[in-house]
Regions:
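Accessory RNA-recognition modules of RNA-modification enzymes
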Residues: 1-198
Length: 198
C-alpha cells in the first residue's frame, strides 16, 4: 500500500498508487510467481526502497516478466531508477546476487535473459532510458503457426500465443488463397497476421 512495505504484484482495484503483492496467482504461469517471490524477498532483505510516485524518490519501479508458451523461454527485466542510494547496498553486487538467485530457481521454462532497465521518467510507465544485459540475451523466441518470432522486452506481441493462433487461423480461413496476391498489413501492430498469410 501507499507508503507501506515493499510490494510486488498488481495495482489494487480502484487505486493508482497502491500495489498488492500477488502470491500464487491462479491465472498466471507458476514460473512468474516463483520469479516475483524471489525478487520481492531479495529486495526486502536488502532494504531497498520502491519508487514513490508522488515524491519521485526511490529505486525499484517495475518487474517485467515475459514467457513464450511454445518455447518456454523467459525474459526478466528489473526496472529501477538511477537513485542507487535507495537500493540498500552496492548496486552491481546486488544485481549479480539477484541473477544468481534467479538462475538457481527450479522453473518449468528456461531463462533466456535477465535485464536491468533504468527509468527516471516521472510518468508511471516502463520506459527504457538504458538497459544492461545481466545474463543471457535481451530477447526470447516464440512460435506461432510454424513461424518463429524474436521478441524484445518492450515489443508488442500477443501475450496469449495459443489464442493468437486460433485467431490467425480463423483470419486465414476467411481470406482464403493468397498465392500471387498482395497483402497490405495496415493497423496490425507487429505484422504477424500478414506473415501468417504470406
Amino acid at each position: 500500500y501507499k507508503d507501506g512495505p515493499l510490494a510486488l504484484g498488481m495495482h489494487k482495484r480502484g487505486s493508482f498508487y497502491d500495489i498488492v503483492t500477488v502470491k500464487d496467482c491462479q491465472i498466471v504461469d507458476s514460473d512468474f510467481c516463483k520469479i516475483l517471490d524471489t525478487v520481492l524477498q531479495f529486495y526486502q532483505n536488502q532494504g531497498a526502497k520502491y519508487y514513490h510516485k508522488l515524491s519521485h524518490i526511490g529505486y525499484l519501479r517495475h518487474l517485467l516478466v515475459r514467457k513464450a508458451v511454445k518455447t518456454e523461454e523467459i525474459l526478466i527485466d528489473l526496472v529501477t531508477t538511477t537513485q542507487t542510494e535507495y537500493c540498500g547496498g552496492e548496486e552491481e553486487i546486488q544485481l549479480a546476487e539477484l541473477v544468481s538467485h534467479l538462475q538457481n530457481l527450479e522453473l518449468k521454462g528456461k531463462i533466456a535473459g535477465i535485464l536491468h532497465t533504468q527509468n527516471d521518467s516521472l510518468a508511471d510507465v516502463v520506459q527504457n532510458d538504458h538497459t544492461d544485459i545481466l545474463s543471457g540475451q535481451d530477447y526470447f523466441f516464440e512460435e506461432l503457426l510454424g513461424l518463429k518470432f524474436r521478441i524484445s522486452p518492450f515489443s508488442f506481441f500477443q501475450t496469449n500465443s495459443l489464442g493468437a493462433e486460433v485467431l490467425y487461423d480463423t483470419a486465414r480461413s476467411y481470406v482464403g488463397n493468397t498465392k500471387d496476391k498482395v497483402i497490405f498489413d495496415l493497423y496490425s501492430g507487429t505484422g504477424t497476421i500478414a506473415q501468417m498469410l504470406a
